């Protein structure tokens, strides 16, 4: 086999999993991390990371890639290219495709399409119930054997407590995480957050209690099963939900030792998305449909509670909930348009704006929430989420000082539904390395001794669709 080598030099390497934060080099050989330390005479390709952060490849455990069935919005290829443009080397795709991702064949299809694109690694999250209808459990065992890394009915929560109880038990048997879309639909289902503004706009409101009730129920179900299944609350938005998770985790820490668990490795976790950290329901005031999402944007008090939840460790994972829709769909009236926005490409800089620059978290915490913690959540921690020797050679290089403007028309994604268009952000991807190969490097002058790579998101999308991203 022909040896491939890439040395990333002169950067500040931060690997939260191993407690490394140092100016040093890293050598990648044949798709694996081979060496960390100063290299005087590098062999093969060299990337000059001067002034940059060198981090484990970012992992997004919550994206929607729409294939099969809704390819006009996104495909696995364009979504994986969008991930690379945003610095993500691994993504986990949700099962609300058409048909739902609820069979072994569907799981295998995702891997096949991702391999063909040659961009980010894509791992499927299988549907917990057949057709995501919340009634009958799917064939979790077969999907897990085929490579599904978790289960969810995302887009809806499992309404029946009995069915959810079964889902948790079967997830425990497969050793996979259960991810819950926390919404009691009998209370939810509105167009935006319930409050004075929804009443003023004449839009059906969606109260916080719809989210809080399901979180409370699920934590009780989990504890009743002695936390046998790893439970994860998706895209959290409410102050009440954060407090419920905080209390549940504190109770788990007391229960853990007697149950044989490590109190530091929580069996209850949650995630937040960038839009819920930076936007409020006030954005809906002009009926801009790019502010309609599920769960909805909440109040500033809720945003502050989410940020506190990140600061105190209640929230362990950051995930984009990348949800593409066509321009035609988003051109309908606010009440009719589908929920969701795209987020993979601006996410890193948005998290920096919300959490890093204000001092809520350190670089180490931010990167742990974007890599190591996600890897552990979906069981990929042996080879991903860190830069230990022998780990997969997935690396994200970040230029913390670069200021850029969000331009949705330059995205790799097929869709353009993003409320951050025109925002000026500080911090950008300098390179995305997948399996030891530089897939994206906006400043080509930093890379020497290698074949030309994509320098634009559009170039990434083209390569992915042509199958030339390898």
Predicted regions and their residues:
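Metal-associated gating/positioning segment near the N- to mid-region
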Residues: 50-117
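Histidine/acidic residue-rich metal-binding segments in metalloenzymes
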Residues: 135-318
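His/Asp/Glu-enriched, well-ordered alpha-helical/loop segment
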Residues: 200-228, 290, 311-312, 316-318, ...
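Alpha-helix-loop-beta-strand connector modules within alpha/beta enzyme cores
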Residues: 104-121, 169-180, 346, 350
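C-terminal cap of metal-dependent C-N hydrolases
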Residues: 11, 333-336, 389-456
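Divalent metal-coordination and catalytic microenvironments
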Residues: 11, 26, 31, 51, ...
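Histidine-rich, glycine-flanked metal-binding segment
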Residues: 1-56
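Active-site mouth loops of central-metabolism enzymes
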Residues: 61-74, 97, 123-136, 202-208
């Amino acid at each position: 086999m022909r040896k491939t080598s890439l040395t990333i030099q002169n950067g500040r390497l931060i690997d939260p999993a191993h407690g490394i934060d140092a100016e040093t080099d890293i050598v990648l050989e044949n798709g694996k991390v081979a060496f960390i330390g100063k290299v005087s005479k590098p062999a093969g390709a060299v990337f000059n990371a001067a002034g940059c952060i060198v981090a484990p490849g970012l992992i997004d455990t919550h994206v929607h890639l729409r294939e099969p069935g809704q390819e006009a919005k996104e495909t696995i290829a364009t979504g994986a290219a969008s991930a690379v443009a945003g610095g993500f080397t691994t993504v986990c795709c949700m099962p609300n495709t058409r048909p739902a991702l609820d069979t072994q064949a569907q799981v295998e299809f995702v891997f096949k399409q991702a391999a063909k694109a040659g961009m980010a690694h894509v791992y499927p999250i299988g549907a917990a119930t057949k057709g995501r209808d919340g009634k009958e459990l799917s064939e979790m065992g077969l999907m897990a054997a085929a490579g599904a890394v978790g289960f969810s009915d995302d887009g809806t929560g499992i309404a029946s407590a009995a069915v959810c109880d079964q889902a948790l038990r079967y997830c425990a048997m497969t050793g996979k995480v259960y991810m819950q879309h926390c919404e009691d639909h009998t209370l939810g289902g509105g167009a935006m957050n319930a409050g004075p503004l929804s009443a003023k706009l004449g839009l059906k409101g969606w109260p916080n209690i719809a989210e809080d009730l399901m979180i409370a129920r699920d934590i009780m179900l989990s504890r009743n099963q002695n936390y046998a299944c790893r439970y994860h609350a998706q895209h959290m938005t409410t102050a009440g939900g954060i407090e419920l998770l905080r209390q549940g985790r504190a109770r788990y820490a007391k229960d853990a030792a007697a149950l044989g668990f490590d109190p530091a490795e929580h069996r209850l976790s949650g995630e937040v998305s960038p839009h819920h950290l930076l936007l409020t329901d006030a954005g809906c005031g002009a009926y801009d449909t790019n502010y309609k999402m599920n769960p909805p944007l909440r109040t500033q008090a809720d945003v502050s509670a989410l940020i506190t939840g990140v600061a105190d460790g209640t929230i362990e994972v950051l995930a984009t909930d990348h949800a593409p829709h066509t321009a035609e769909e988003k051109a309908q009236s606010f009440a009719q348009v589908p929920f969701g926005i795209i987020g993979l490409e601006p996410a890193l800089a948005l998290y920096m704006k919300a959490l890093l620059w204000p001092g809520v978290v350190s670089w180490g915490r931010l990167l742990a929430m974007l890599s190591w913690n996600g890897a552990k959540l979906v069981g990929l921690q042996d080879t991903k989420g860190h830069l230990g020797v022998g780990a997969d050679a997935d690396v994200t290089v970040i230029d913390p000082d670069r200021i850029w403007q969000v331009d949705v028309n330059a995205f790799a994604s097929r869709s353009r539904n993003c409320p951050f268009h025109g925002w000026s952000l500080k911090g950008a991807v300098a390179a995305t390395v997948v399996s030891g190969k530089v897939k994206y490097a906006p400043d080509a002058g930093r890379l020497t001794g290698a074949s030309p790579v994509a320098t634009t998101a559009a170039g990434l999308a083209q390569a992915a669709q042509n199958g030339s991203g390898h």
